[in-house]
Amino acid sequence: MTADVNTNSDLVMKRELLGWLDAQRTHVAEQVRAMPAEARRRSVVPSGWTPRGLLRHLTLDVERVWFRAVMAGEEVDLPEGYAGWIASEQDSDEELLEKYADECRLATAAIGEMELDARPVWWFEDGGDPPHSSLREILLHVIVETATHAGHLDICRELVDGGQRLVLDEPTT
């Protein structure tokens, strides 16, 4: 009986964590869409990132790396160094948003049947041990990272056009 209860509670917890992650993913996409097009291509911070670059970073360095490469062990193309932060001028804003949405769907599908206690199956050859030891920890990390970057986009948007987003996110179900 205890195993069934634990498995059921893990399924509920996983669904809740994915719901919160989806809420943050939506926050990111909404803020990028809400910005004036020219503002998506320029930086307003000393580090030099742009909203388009941040979107690409979340697509490749976060969703693809953590879920498809690290957890699922898929052999996927990964950017090197800071290349994930550089959005090609060839990609339209809508294409970058579509790539982000597609990668989020692929990431969610890749971990679909995994238990929260599942261990990473891949890590960078020269990177030592993975910093997180389970899908649960990786989900929490990605939620925090995505929410942090959503906040960066909130600030960017307010600086460029004064727009503000009231953060009353609820998990998707």
Where are these regions (language model features)?
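Acidic/histidine-rich alpha-helical segments that form the ligand environment
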Residues: 84-123, 134-147
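Active-site rim elements
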Residues: 12-17, 93-97
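Short, contiguous alpha-helical
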Residues: 4-8, 14, 18-33, 37-84, ...
